[in-house]
Amino acid sequence: MSKAVGIDLGTTYSCVAHFANDRVDIIANDQGNRTTPSFVAFTDTERLIGDAAKNQAAMNPSNTVFDAKRLIGRNFNDPEVQADMKHFPFKLIDVDGKPQIQVEFKGETKNFTPEQISSMVLGKMKETAESYLGAKVNDAVVTVPAYFNDSQRQATKDAGTIAGLNVLRIINEPTAAAIAYGLDKKGKEEHVLIFDLGGGTFDVSLLSIEDGIFEVKATAGDTHLGGEDFDNRLVNHFIQEFKRKNKKDLSTNQRALRRLRTACERAKRTLSSSAQTSVEIDSLFEGIDFYTSITRARFEELCADLFRSTLDPVEKVLRDAKLDKSQVDEIVLVGGSTRIPKVQKLVTDYFNGKEPNRSINPDEAVAYGAAVQAAILTGDESSKTQDLLLLDVAPLSLGIETAGGVMTKLIPRNSTIPTKKSEIFSTYADNQPGVLIQVFEGERAKTKDNNLLGKFELSGIPPAPRGVPQIEVTFDVDSNGILNVSAVEKGTGKSNKITITNDKGRLSKEDIEKMVAEAEKFKEEDEKESQRIASKNQLESIAYSLKNTISEAGDKLEQADKDTVTKKAEETISWLDSNTTASKEEFDDKLKELQDIANPIMSKLYQAGGAPGGAAGGAPGGFPGGAPPAPEAEGPTVEEVD
């Protein structure tokens, strides 16, 4: 059985799943949650990922990083990055035109790229899967929003590499959700619209599903719209209300903001099932308690424009697929934000009262589909996956700049991938020795309005009048939606090519290798820390249980012996209180000291008729019935039993 998993790397939450024996398991994390917050926190002593990181966000706002997906593959001066910076409690800095996150970690200032933060979340998902499956997990299918551009896809793939994963494929979230919906559907062709509104991104895809063939007809979306934006509206609303009531601006205090944001997120969820909810935060800012309430209608009004804007991509997809809305057979809602009643109502009204299909779990569908795809790519023989074929599309048109800054498209948007397209171009001036080939993606007529993916030079063209040399440019989009471009001059056979990986902002091979090594180092440190804590806890529990056993020993021991052990145990406990950051070795030494004193006395107690019932096995060297202690260097240690 292959141990390949599907990972839904979300803006706010991530989810991991595994396909085996004809079924998909969504894997719960160590807290028992089936989704894990995409949060990473750095403290003086350790690095926290997931629930642990999110839970301490209010105490440590400037070193708790979230929303890396809104930064990944983007430039620092991207207007959306600039707008987000205003909401982020952590510090973003500009490194070679790319955003990096600056935090304090173990007493020093560290910079991390969004890829590194995402790789830590992916690493956490990998560990979650490994502890459930009981085996190493190397291969994964990772999902991205369908509307992610080339650089965002490439950066996500890099994050997987840094996490020590072999990324089998990057697939689009709505397509993965469609697999979850259609895996058991057999029979006539149906048109399915996937409406995926998550924590930070929004996608709409239209597919035709027939007998295991999933063909994406068109896709559209907004890589910067989701639940976070609704939270922001609530946060701003309450900041204003707090100002009105108390004449104070709490937005200057990051801790207050984080507590308010957490309360807003909770309120938003409650409003999906209740018509109104109260928000109560004690001592929010400068000792002022903030008690207020909000109705569903008010929330809908605050987010009205955002909710309405979700219908634009729906219209675009129908136009691109040349379908009328009456021809859509099923509407499938994916992503936590589709639980908002107003969003559901807008969709239903748009499709003239047609109710959306609720057969799949909106939080888990994407990871589910990714797990199925991972099983297929690693050769799973299940009957369910045998005939499954995925035909996805490139979300944005791809082309090169020709004379006058014109965008000449080679691959139009919504072309099925993988795809390959060649065109012949020529020189613009007589005796031109070389051409600069600039690759863009986007829908506008002029390249300056589109996104530059990369450029390369094809030189050594022999002198000739303009228009004579023949330069063949080939675009090749692979199944991850990542582009390779090559150019060859027909006369001389001179060629040059690049994988478009956004030269401007792409991590180089060396960068990635360095980050992989760093990730290993962090992992080792995390493990060291957890071993240190285990030693500390062991010492503490043994000291306390010794104290208790002695106090219940009655006249089975001489008073002098009892005093000796009690004194040593109390000494150990007070040492622990003042040395919480000691090393593992120090804790182990203290344990040995304690056991050297206690073990001989405790064995007297056991020979005198055993420890009192309640303390059986609680003391170190707890050998019931006076069995001799095992010959161990440190004296036997017994796990506590209830």
From Swiss-Prot:
It comes from the Eukaryota. GO terms for molecular function: ATP binding; ATP hydrolysis activity; ATP-dependent protein folding chaperone; heat shock protein binding; protein folding chaperone; tRNA binding; unfolded protein binding. There is a cross-link at residue 556 (Glycyl lysine isopeptide (Lys-Gly) (interchain with G-Cter in ubiquitin)). Keywords: Acetylation, ATP-binding, Cell wall, Cytoplasm, Isopeptide bond, Nucleotide-binding, Phosphoprotein, Secreted, Stress response, Ubl conjugation. It is found in: Cytoplasm; Secreted, Cell wall. The keyword Ubl conjugation applies. Residues 606-642 are annotated as: Disordered. One of its GO terms (biological process) is protein polyubiquitination. The modification N-acetylserine is found at residue 2. InterPro entries: ATPase_NBD (IPR043129), Heat_shock_70_CS (IPR018181), HSP70_C_sf (IPR029048), HSP70_peptide-bd_sf (IPR029047), Hsp_70_fam (IPR013126). Residues 610-625 have a biased composition (Gly residues). The modification Phosphoserine is found at residues 62, 551, 603. One of its GO terms (cellular component) is plasma membrane. It holds the Pfam family HSP70. The keyword Repeat does not apply. PROSITE patterns: HSP70_1, HSP70_2, HSP70_3. Present with 269000 molecules/cell in log phase SD medium. Binds human HTN3/histatin-5, a peptide from saliva, and mediates its fungicidal activity. Interacts with polyadenylate-binding protein PAB1 and Hsp70 chaperone SSA1 on translating ribosomes. Interacts with NAP1. May play a role in the transport of polypeptides both across the mitochondrial membranes and into the endoplasmic reticulum. A functional difference between SSA1 and SSA2 proteins is expected. SSA1 can participate in the ATP-dependent disassembly of clathrin-coated vesicles. Belongs to the heat shock protein 70 family. This is Heat shock protein SSA1.
